[in-house]
Amino acid sequence: MIILKRLLQDKGAVIALGIIVLYVFLGLAAPLVTFYDPNHIDTANKFAGMSFQHLLGTDHLGRDILTRLIYAIRPSLLYVFVALFVSVLIGSILGFLSGYFQGFVDALIMRACDVMLAFPSYVVTLALIALFGMGAENIIMAFILTRWAWFCRVIRTSVMQYTASDHVRFAKTIGMNDMKIIHKHIMPLTLADIAIISSSSMCSMILQISGFSFLGLGVKAPTAEWGMMLNEARKVMFTHPEMMFAPGIAIVIIVMAFNFLSDALQIAIDPRISSKDKLRSVKKGVVQS
């Protein structure tokens, strides 16, 4: 509750949360928000300008851009939520087992993580696309295969830190069950860390699925997706540049929202982190990358 109170005192975090909630609502309630079919082709009305009927105009096939932008939230954001949830779930279970019990269990899980992290996520995704073909489901599968190991390592480090604390040692001394110790004394402390790495990971996953769709390797046509919309707009970017603005701005806004939320979570958990320290760490990360 203290962390939530600090988070809500940050105006940037509140705005970021509002944007994320708005995106999720629009994605889930897309049929109620817009009355157009995102895949309805009307060549007689192609490249129509902004109007009351089409607030953002139409594309090269006469499809309403705003409608496709809203429906594109589902593969671009909601599918990523599913992949992130499964990845965090697998990584958390293995991370808790590895960090708490250590020994042989820790060595076995860490070697499995080493194997998975030895392959770049883009290489794994391309391999799955080559084996099973294009589609959002294959990209989601690649997210899960590559991300769980990273989450496992981060959560393991956090669990090992809390396992060495005095209150956990006292709980072991009085004979408390291991699962009960994890559930009551360690899990609540690690939830904040999990929330931070999850929110920061969302940005790269959104950019990755949009990037693959932009290259024609992601979501299959005619399903609306931001990266695919950018690819379609690329062909007419000099004659109708406005077609690129809508999906591009949508991606930038949601990625910035998750970035702000991740930074705000870190400050809410550790108020000693100042804006100056945060700016310095961001610059250092940019230089290293």
From Swiss-Prot:
Q: Which Pfam families match?
A: BPD_transp_1 (PF00528), OppC_N (PF12911)
Q: How does it sit in the membrane?
A: Multi-pass membrane protein
Query: What regulation of activity is recorded for this protein?
Result: Nickel/cobalt import is reduced in the presence of zinc.
Location of this chain's protein in the cell? Cell membrane
Query: How is this protein annotated for GO cellular component?
Result: plasma membrane
Q: What induces it?
A: Repressed by zinc.
The ABC transmembrane type-1 domain is annotated at: 73-262
Q: What happens when the gene is disrupted?
A: Deletion of the cntABCDF genes decreases nickel and cobalt intracellular levels and decreases virulence.
Identify the SUPFAM superfamilies for this entry.
Answer: MetI-like (SSF161098)
Bilayer-crossing regions: 13-33, 77-97, 115-135, 194-214, 249-269
UniProt KW keywords: Cell membrane, Cobalt, Cobalt transport, Ion transport, Membrane, Nickel, Nickel transport, Transmembrane, Transmembrane helix, Transport, Zinc, Zinc transport
Similarity comment text for this entry: Belongs to the binding-protein-dependent transport system permease family.
Q: What does this protein do?
A: Part of the ABC transporter complex CntABCDF (Opp1) involved in the uptake of metal in complex with the metallophore staphylopine (StP). Involved in the import of divalent metals ions such as nickel, cobalt and zinc. Probably responsible for the translocation of the substrate across the membrane. Plays a major role in nickel/cobalt import in zinc-depleted conditions. Contributes to virulence. Required for full urease activity in vitro.
UniProt protein name: Metal-staphylopine import system permease protein CntC
Q: Which organism is it from?
A: Staphylococcus aureus (strain NCTC 8325 / PS 47)
Which lineage is the organism of this entry classified under, starting from the top rank? Answer: Bacteria, Bacillati, Bacillota, Bacilli, Bacillales
